[in-house]
């Protein structure tokens, strides 16, 4: 019977260890998920426009929409005129849409929301460009080619050597002048 108790105790101990391992794993998983959600929220928060920018953007979008609706009305009017026999130049239709497009783009592109979005885009592109540049410099270094920093350092040394050479030449000229006297 003591053997049965021993097996039962070992079983209980093993199940308890497994439960603890699962609990620890779940706790680590929850921490990782919380960190991910927090990171994601921070990233999303940076992309959400300010309330004023959002309102300005919506206002610009609404004005652009009105431009397109006005253009559609003009197109219907001119189409009706053409259907009633009036001689309508097809270039008028093109001009209506081009004018409307220009005005609509002005309304949208003139908003602070567009400026903010464009600023974020430029910032992201510059970061990507810097990352690509860093990667190319690392690749050059790993392949044994000189990097931009290596070339800059050599250029600085060369300039310093030229400066020193010029100073030595001036001293030599003074010595030669003194010997000639």
Swiss-Prot record:
Keyword Acyltransferase: yes
Applications reported: PHB and PHBV are desirable bioplastic due to their biodegradability, biocompatibility, and mechanical properties. However, PHBV has better mechanical properties than PHB.
Key word Transferase present: yes
GO MF annotations, alphabetized: acyltransferase activity
The entry's keywords: Acyltransferase, PHA biosynthesis, PHB biosynthesis, Transferase
BP terms from Gene Ontology: poly(3-hydroxyalkanoate) biosynthetic process; poly-hydroxybutyrate biosynthetic process
E.C. no: 2.3.1.-
Subunit structure: Heterodimer with PhaC.
Family the UniProt entry places it in: Belongs to the PHA/PHB synthase family.
Name listed for the protein in its UniProt record: Poly(3-hydroxyalkanoate) polymerase subunit PhaE
Organism name: Haloarcula marismortui (strain ATCC 43049 / DSM 3752 / JCM 8966 / VKM B-1809)
């Amino acid at each position: 019977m003591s053997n049965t108790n021993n097996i039962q105790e070992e079983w209980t101990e093993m199940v308890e260890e497994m439960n603890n391992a699962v609990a620890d794993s779940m706790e680590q998983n929850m921490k990782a998920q919380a960190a991910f959600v927090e990171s994601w929220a921070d990233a999303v928060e940076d992309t959400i426009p300010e309330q004023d920018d959002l309102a300005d953007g919506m206002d610009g979008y609404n004005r652009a929409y009105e431009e397109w609706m006005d253009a559609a009305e003009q197109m219907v009017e001119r189409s009706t005129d053409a259907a009633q026999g009036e001689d309508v130049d097809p270039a008028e239709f093109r001009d209506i849409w081009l004018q409307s497009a220009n005005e609509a783009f002005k309304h949208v592109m003139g908003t602070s929301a567009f400026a903010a979005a464009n600023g974020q885009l430029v910032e992201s592109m510059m970061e990507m460009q810097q990352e690509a540049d860093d990667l190319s410099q690392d690749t050059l270094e790993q392949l044994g080619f000189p990097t931009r920093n290596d070339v800059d350092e050599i250029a600085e040394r060369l300039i310093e050597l030229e400066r020193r050479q010029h100073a030595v030449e001036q001293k030599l000229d003074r010595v030669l002048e003194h010997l000639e006297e």
